[in-house]
Amino acid sequence: MEKPTRQTPFYTQHRAELLVLSSQIAAALLHALARVVEVGSGLKERVHPFTVLQIRLFITVLGCTAYLWRARIDFLGPTGLRPLLALRAAGGVFGACGFYLSISYLSLSEATVLNFIAPLGAIMLTTYWEGRTFAFLDLIACITALAGVVLVLQPIPIYKAVAQAEISSSISTDPYAHLKGVVSGITGVAGGIVAFSAMNRLGKNVQPAVTINYFGVSICIVTTAFSTIMPEVVWPTRIESWCLLAIIGILGLVMEYLLTAGLGSDDPRVTIMIYSQVLWALFLDWAIWRSHVNVLTVLGSMVVVASLAVPYLFRESSHPKEDMFSTRSGMDDIEEGQDEAHANYISLE
C-alpha cells in the first residue's frame, strides 16, 4: 500500500477514522434521543424502551434485508454457522434490552460506560473457550475497567466523600430506581459478552448485514411478544414521539453503515475511535439534561476507555503481522450489541 504523501487530502488519508467517528456520533445521538422519549424530556408522553427498540430495529431490518436481497446473499447465512448466529442474536437481545432499560434510570454517560465492559468480558470468555492462558495485561485491564465503572456510577459513600453537591438531574434521585438502572445495565453487559463472544467465533465468515438481521428480527419478535403481555408496552400516540422514533431508526441504520464502512481498515486508530462514544455521551448529558459532570465521572470514563484501548494498541504494536482476528472481531462489532451496544454495541455495545 502506497504511503500517503503530504499532498493527500485530509479526508482521503483519514477516511476510515472519520467514518467510525461519525458512526459514534450517530450512536450517541440515537441513544440520547432514545433516552429523551423514554423519560419524556419535554414530551407529553413516555415511550417504553421495548417500543423504542422495536421501531428502531424494525427500520434497521428493512435496510439490511433490502441490501441482502439486492446483493443476493442468503438471509440465513452459512448453514454450519446458524447456531452461532442464533446465539449472537440471543445475547444481543439481552444486551440491547438491558442497555435501553438502563438509560431510563441512569445518565447516558453512566449507561454507555457500563455497557463498554462487555468487550473485556468477551475476551475473557473466548480465552476460556479456546483454552488459552489469560494474559496478565487483560487481567489488569479488567480490574482497571471495573474500578473505572465504580467511579462513574459513584456509589453514595464515595460520592458524598468527594463532594456534597446536588445529585445530577439526569440521574434518578430514587435509590431503588438507580439500582434498577445498574441491574439492567449489568444484564445488558452479560448479554453483550455472549453476543461479542459469538461474533468472535463467527469472525469474517458471515456478512455483517446477516448478523445484524438475526439480531434485529429477534428484537422485533421479543418486543412484540412483550407488548402482548405488558400493558405499558404500547405504541406512542403523539406525532412528535413518532418523529423522534423515526429519527432514531434512521440514525441506527446510518450508524451501522458508517461503522461497517470504516472498520474495513486495518489501522488500529479506527477501532479506538469507537471509544469516543463515551465523550459524546458526556457532552449530550450536559447539553440536553444539563447534568453536572464531576471529576469522578470524567476520571472513571477515561479509566474505562484506557483499559479497553491500551491492551488493543499494545497487541497491535507487539504483533504487527500477527492475525489478532479473534480480539479484533469483538472490538469491531461493539455498536452492533448496544443497541446497541453495544453494543454496543454494544457499547461497547
Curated annotation (Swiss-Prot):
Residue ranges of the TM segments: 49-69, 89-109, 111-131, 133-153, 179-199, 215-235, 244-264, 269-289, 294-314
Keyword Protease listed: no
Disulphides: none
EamA domain span: 25-153
GO cellular component, one term: membrane
Domain of life assignment: Eukaryota
Family named by the database record: Belongs to the TPT transporter family. SLC35D subfamily.
Physiological role: Probable transporter; part of the gene cluster that mediates the biosynthesis of the secondary metabolite victorin, the molecular basis for Victoria blight of oats.
Name of the featured protein: Probable transporter vicT
